[in-house]
Design a protein with these regions (language model features):
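Helix-turn-helix/winged-helix DNA-binding modules
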Residues: 76, 157, 170-171, 200-201
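Hydrophobic residue at a beta-alpha junction
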Residues: 60-64, 168, 173
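Regulatory hinge/linker segments at domain boundaries
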Residues: 138-167
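Recognition helix of helix-turn-helix DNA-binding domains
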Residues: 172-203
Length: 203
């Protein structure tokens, strides 16, 4: 891995100590890990260092941080952005994908799951789990409930295979199992998932 900076915008110290140790295993030297607790400082650090990987904790100031993600993608579109959030916050995760993130980590994830998610993202893939797949499919139906209303959604232009992958993931299959079932290479399944992310970003 190239020695390029990465940045963490963090709220949960214990979780981010774990993330830092995983990033070291993935090749990021500690001297190139930049830490920030607020968006004002993070914006300054972003301009100074142009990190290629940015971890953003969505525990606090969620709407402001979603807006910050959009700002990052405008000025640094090649940055890999990973959000950190609770597993049950699927609508927040969907909003983050709309803003342009490449992946996510849950507080509930094990060390191995965090390692695999970050590794998948850095090699060009995108993680997905059953609840997110179900959410995308329900969004695709045209209506989605928010806390205050039900609105008509702009449909996601999914291909037949992208729809099939989402259905299989919503049924509990992993990308690895889907690749075996479809007798295709895993990277092709990961490519379809990445394309789904990109289509959500364009909504």
């Amino acid at each position: 891995m190239l020695p390029v900076p990465m940045m963490m915008i963090k709220d949960q110290p214990t979780f981010h100590h774990l993330s830092e140790s995983i990033l070291i295993r993935l090749g990021y030297p500690t001297e190139l890990m930049i830490h920030s607790h607020d968006l004002i400082e993070a914006e300054q650090l972003l301009q100074q260092h142009l990190p290629n990987l940015i971890l953003i904790d969505l525990c606090l100031d969620q709407s402001e941080r979603i807006s910050f993600i959009r700002k990052i993608k405008k000025v640094h579109p090649d940055a890999h952005i990973i959000v950190v959030l609770a597993q049950q916050e699927t609508s927040l995760l969907f909003a983050a994908i709309q803003a342009g993130v490449q992946g996510y980590i849950f507080y509930e994830h094990t060390e191995a799951e965090i390692f695999n998610h970050i590794k998948t993202i850095l090699r060009g893939g995108a993680p997905i789990h059953d609840a997110l797949a179900q959410y995308i499919l329900s969004y695709q139906l045209g209506f989605h409930k928010t806390q205050s209303t039900t609105k008509i959604n702009q449909p996601i232009q999914l291909t037949a295979i992208e729809h099939d992958i989402l259905k299989l993931i919503s049924d509990g299959l992993s990308p690895q199992h889907i690749a075996q079932q479809m007798t295709v290479a895993l990277y092709k399944i990961e490519g379809h998932i990445r394309n789904i992310y990109q289509k959500i970003t364009y909504l």
